[in-house]
Amino acid sequence: MQIILLEKVVNLGNLGDVVRVKDGYARNFLIPNKQARRATDSAIKEFEARRAELEKLAAEKLAAAQAEGEKLNGLTLQLSQKAGVDGRLFGSVTNHDIADALVAQGFKVEKAQVRMPNGPLKTVGDHPVVVSLHTDVAVDVTVLVQGDAV
């Protein structure tokens, strides 16, 4: 299916690109999330008329993400979990736990934006985590997991 991208999509293209994707990807993900439209002649003409407005919105989203990223960059987040004497946690710290802790500190972060390169955290100590605020803005956050004695 031919679609017009209404915003930048990772590994697919930028705003205004006409790309070919699988029908299911377009119908079930891109179009419902308002990231794309079918590339009909009328849709292309309408898009060209609204192009400046959409580019302005994309620039505002990027600026907001960069401002949030400057506040988040280099942040050390402290979480405490029950742990055994060997430093292993009972359970784990997931991206959901980290997102909740960041929201409690006043940041607008969803769990899908928290990237954990080594999977859930299962040990006590410092762990690097990447928070992807925008397709172009990713910041590093250090999570300090402290163990509570059982």
From Swiss-Prot:
Protein keywords: Ribonucleoprotein, Ribosomal protein, RNA-binding, rRNA-binding
InterPro entries: Ribosomal_bL9, Ribosomal_bL9/RNase_H1_N, Ribosomal_bL9_bac/chp, Ribosomal_bL9_C, Ribosomal_bL9_C_sf, Ribosomal_bL9_N, Ribosomal_bL9_N_sf
Top-level taxon of origin: Bacteria
Keyword Zinc included in the entry's annotation: no
Ubl conjugation found in the keyword field: no
A GO cellular component annotation in the UniProt record: ribonucleoprotein complex
Gene3D superfamilies, A to Z: Ribosomal protein L9, C-terminal domain, Ribosomal protein L9, N-terminal domain
One Pfam family this sequence matches: Ribosomal_L9_C
Gene Ontology molecular functions: rRNA binding; structural constituent of ribosome
GO biological process: translation
Function: Binds to the 23S rRNA.
NCBIfam families in the record: L9
Stated family: Belongs to the bacterial ribosomal protein bL9 family.
Name by which UniProt lists this protein: Large ribosomal subunit protein bL9
Lineage: Bacteria, Pseudomonadati, Pseudomonadota, Betaproteobacteria, Burkholderiales
Gene: rplI
